[in-house]
Design a protein with these regions (language model features):
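Residue-level detector of alpha-helix boundaries and kinks
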Residues: 14, 119-120, 150, 205-208
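Alpha-helix C-terminal capping segments
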Residues: 23, 38-44, 91, 139-142, ...
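PAPS-dependent sulfotransferases, especially Golgi type II membrane carbohydrate sulfotransferases
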Residues: 1-7, 167, 171-241
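A local structural micro-motif
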Residues: 31-32, 147, 174, 235
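PAPS-dependent sulfotransferase catalytic core
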Residues: 1-72, 183-192, 199
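PAPS-dependent sulfotransferase catalytic domain
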Residues: 50, 54-176, 191-200
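Generic detection of long, well-ordered alpha-helical segments
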Residues: 13, 125, 155, 159, ...
Length: 241
């Protein structure tokens, strides 16, 4: 049986580790956490092997320039330094490659990036915008090879999303995939924590992303329409809800 490959991507603070852990609970899948190379190809006994990388601080659509270095970032000459030896385009050359991108509401992702990630607004916003741009580009260029998952929808509808993932990867769904939160290496919890969604709304924080970053905001909304497990309410219902 020829091995299949998987790349899980998303901006920092958007649920990449949770998603990767849930997927890796499947008995036929093994996912490495933020490996810089292709060590996943050395894994044995699994149908699907993969890696999880964050955009844009760990991986970009194209391989970084040889001139790019961490020093450039420290000096303010580069926004990010991609630690990955390989680009997303490099991953796309692997046989039977699938890409799963996770997206999170921008205000929440940026707020978490500032609080937990200790980034400035500018830095956290850039990471979210760039991840959205790349995931959107991938859905346009490689629609059959890319699946998009919403962090909020994953938390509220974990089984439905894992069923989507399993179907996308052409494997049988397993209930053990729902055990992901327990095995999350950084933030273990007994189950899905719905307190992590819509935090900015609860705190009445609005960064006006549609005005500051209109392109990324529009792309996010397009991506969101691709990853709902339940129908989106009509505009009037959302207004009255």
């Amino acid at each position: 049986m020829e091995r299949r490959h998987l790349l899980i991507i998303g901006a920092p603070r958007t649920g990449t580790t949770l998603l990767a852990t849930m997927i890796s609970r499947h008995t036929e899948i093994a996912v490495l956490n933020e490996d810089k190379g292709w060590s996943m190809r050395k894994l044995l006994g699994k149908v699907i092997v993969g890696n999880k990388r964050c955009i844009p601080n760990q991986i970009e659509i194209k391989r970084r320039s040889r001139l790019n270095s961490r020093l450039w970032k420290k000096m303010g000459l580069a926004k990010e330094y991609q630690s990955s030896q390989f680009s997303i385009e490099d991953y796309l050359t692997l046989p039977h490659i699938k890409v799963i991108g996770i997206i999170r509401e921008g205000n929440d992702a940026i707020l978490s990036g500032m609080r937990r990630g200790k980034k400035s607004f500018r830095g956290a916003a850039y990471r979210w915008c760039r991840a959205i741009e790349i995931i959107h580009e991938l859905t346009v260029r490689f629609p059959e090879a890319v699946l998009v998952v919403s962090f909020e929808d994953l938390v509220v509808h974990p089984k439905e999303n894992m069923e989507r993932v399993a179907a996308f990867l052409n494997i049988d769904y397993q209930d053990r995939m729902l055990e992901g939160p327990v095995y999350n290496p950084w933030y273990p919890e007994s189950g899905m924590n719905e307190e992590k969604i819509n935090r900015s709304q609860k705190e009445k924080i609005d960064y006006n992303l549609a005005e500051l970053f209109p392109s990324a905001d529009a792309q996010y909304r397009k991506l969101l329409s691709l990853c709902q497990t339940t129908p989106l309410p009509e505009p009037e219902q959302r207004k009255n809800g």
